């Protein structure tokens, strides 16, 4: 029987001691001293594909003349292995040490520097014989060699090292080794910074099966066993050898110690401070309202925003205001990974810009995707107001009811409705006072109405994606502003391009929303025209007590809506 090792002669130091373990079994319990083990090392020059083993190595041949590799023995040495005494057993494991003779270590060839078709390999054979009797004919002794790869001391590869096949020269990293198998190991996920492996670790396991006979020096083909310590990956195969009894040379393989994958990056749990500008601050609040009001809304990437309450808006925007965990870890994943809607990760300070057309929601219409022209259907005055339920829990989730207004009613020919054509990117904003719309007796009929002293301003912005005036594609969103007196210039800082003031007036001060064509459907405090139903954000009790805070909250929210319309245009 024999054990085979292949030394990486390009980096191997021939004065290094080779250590290993020889394992075999017998039928009967026997003392280790009953056996004799002879270690023999042989060196071979292997010529690949088309080169004969001539001294010049420069004689190419045709495929029909030489289809396999040729191996020439260039070195041989043998030494007995001392076996210590031990208890009798059937299984034996004997440690061994082997070292090249000092005289030949300095003269041993490593590789042919000018010919990549020639490789040098060395094979260590262990011949086991019993002193008094041979192994039984039915016994197949097993021998296993576990040795440290001789090239793992961190020495760099020489520039003239050339291993491989088909005239390919491989420049391998520092910690590479010849593996005892050509195809039984999987290719490792190569670690760019592998830890150096000490020479005391056992890394290679080769197992051979040999049937015993009277000739103890017979050579048999080794059977390789995968090593559990490493994962090997190689697309190369060893050169076939059909004309030589020597086991074929196995090229070097890249490998790395298999290790656990890197832990996933933990998203940042704290968001940066809110930008000082009002538009950026309102964008932060709008983002939180999105996560509270519409947990089903999602991006197409997809990434669902978790539902959670949003913090209250302060009365004035300030750069010192921070959101404690204002964004969940999922939304932070966008900025960390650089994926998702472009507007959400382009700005490092989270200066929010309204999502572009990739933003999708179950409650949003597709009309926001393209807006070549805009058409606006004016408001019909004098219709009965919708009732506002006063017991709604959320100031941004209370729908308006009792709306019987239809598009045909508002935009009918007998109402003398005129259309305003808006250029792309142009906004139409008009403010309506509740006293201009209805008579007082029409408002008193609703007992659940909110009543606020002062003026109420309903601001509406509409746009359409239809160039033919189709009202089904009309999109509108509104915003309310409350003040103790008439609206001032400070309340109208949202770039109003045009103001429409109806002529009808009444003395009602009740909270009232203007009735708009096509109705509304609420989505994250943004109302879009989709049917004849109406929906609008309502104030809660705390904000009703502070009209200025309510006014600021809706003003900031309206600023986000304007930015969103501009982005969509």
UniProtKB/Swiss-Prot annotation:
Upregulation: By nitrogen starvation.
Region of interest: Disordered: 195-219, 255-274
Biased composition (Pro residues): 264-274
Gene Ontology process terms (BP): conjugation with cellular fusion; meiotic cell cycle
Signal sequence range: none
Ranges of compositional bias, category Low complexity: 198-219
Coiled-coil spans in chain: none
Domain of life where this protein originates: Eukaryota
InterPro entries for the chain: Arrestin-like_C
The UniProt record lists the keyword DNA damage: no
GO CC term, one of those recorded: cell division site
Keywords for this protein: Conjugation, Meiosis, Stress response
Biological role stated in the UniProt entry: Has a role in promoting meiosis whereby it is involved in establishing the mating pheromone signaling pathway. It also has a role in suppressing meiosis until the conjugation process is complete.
Assigned protein family: Belongs to the arrestin family.
Protein name in UniProt: Protein ste7
Annotated organism of origin: Schizosaccharomyces pombe (strain 972 / ATCC 24843) (Fission yeast)
Gene name of the record: ste7
